Amino acid sequence: DFECPFCQRHFAQTWPEIKRNYVDTGKVRYVFLDFPLEQIHFKARKAAEAAHCAAEQGKFWEMHDILFAQNGNLDVGQYVNYAKKLGLEAFAFDLCLGSGKQSAKINRNVASGTSIGINATPSFIIARSERGDIVSGGNIITGAQPYRDCYNSLLLQAQKLITRFLATDDSPC
């Protein structure tokens, strides 16, 4: 939720360490799913649509970063300017944003989260996966938790479990 202050805090304080220590090293795969809390964050859905419109031109993460950098002060009138700043084709971006065609994707993301018990932002799942589907167990973390106190220990624990699994004869590989 690009309008959520706790999501913004996670993005600014916790995400850089997770990215540096786990994602960039290939130890984990990070999947971002939209979960705009529209009943309290009225601008969050359109911001999510803007990120997906940028994704059509290969710039999801760059738009993601710009939107979170706004600290909740989202202005749909600025989205085309952000797109231009990223070097996107502005007409195509604006057409995408005005069409609402990304709405179905956002609805699927929300339904997916809701189906596994997500009801707040930010929320994270640390689990073993296969082809993007959650395969076994997992921990749901809700709220902007500190990296050192929460994520690092859970990610290390998950990494040890996966290493142990791959070393046994039970491995499907």
Where are these predicted regions, by residue range?
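C-terminal cap of thioredoxin/glutaredoxin-like
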Residues: 11-15, 20, 81-173
